[in-house]
């Protein structure tokens, strides 16, 4: 058996790749709670792929059969209800862990040099994930699915010159119909998952090229030959590790990182299963009541709002009275996230060693983003619209203020070694 494994290893160095990118990957030893969400995102991705495959076996991608096929899955397919709820709950769980993953990058400066490309790959994953969720949202062919897609797709019509043609191309018809459903199904099941998986591979490769950031925002890599003896004393089981990697204050991902992540996975699965079995609709935020009615082009729901993970950007859109300018503002609210590495001109990464102004700016940005998420799910009354305008201003002011104060920001001295605050 060992001879066969050696033969395969010489032709396909899978074990070397496993050691380099997983078991012996150098992980800063002061990783904390905020460093769980990358692994959790991978776990949810596996859940979405597996449950999606099973749902596809019984789903009918046509205007006549889509809603009925979902009802069939829920009522007649053995454990079909469980698979459907695992997929719908998983979609929201995906965005929960992704938003927390992005927030960790924000507070610890994981977007700064030399990790700009790593951040961009992460933002591209977020963008594709939003497209994937939007395409999948139409597939149940319920009332909110239909009219939510109608509202979002119509926004492209506001783009000058190409707007009408672009809207027609996205829909595949002059109205949202079975042709739109077929198109979205193909993109949701085949095209976008391929792009998503490719971007995840690039994201991981970029991470392993520059190394992981840590809560202190300092590098753990040192010139060759400078590894301290304290590492061998603390982790005698990995004496050979120091011969391969000249990295101080780091530990192998396995078993230390895997054990840490397993604790997070256990906590996550507890919460996930609680929602799955006791509150899968989550009060209408995960699965809206109108979506249990078949799509009816002649009956508009009283209040149309996207799923919760789109509402912050939807609130920015509604905050601007002009349709075209609203689309521009919504697009800008996503584009500025891509440009974050160049807005922040400070040499210090982590908020721990930056000014109080920076901490206040992060807090007001977080409050603005959450408030926009709440307002985006509410009706567009004059009061809510005014609040959305105020919080939209706060959202964009984060980036403007960051660019101004970060250049000459008063920072605290950085530690020479990682700390365990």
Task: Give the role of each language-model region.
Residues 1-93, 97-421:
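Membrane-embedded and interfacial regions of multi-pass energy-transducing membrane proteins
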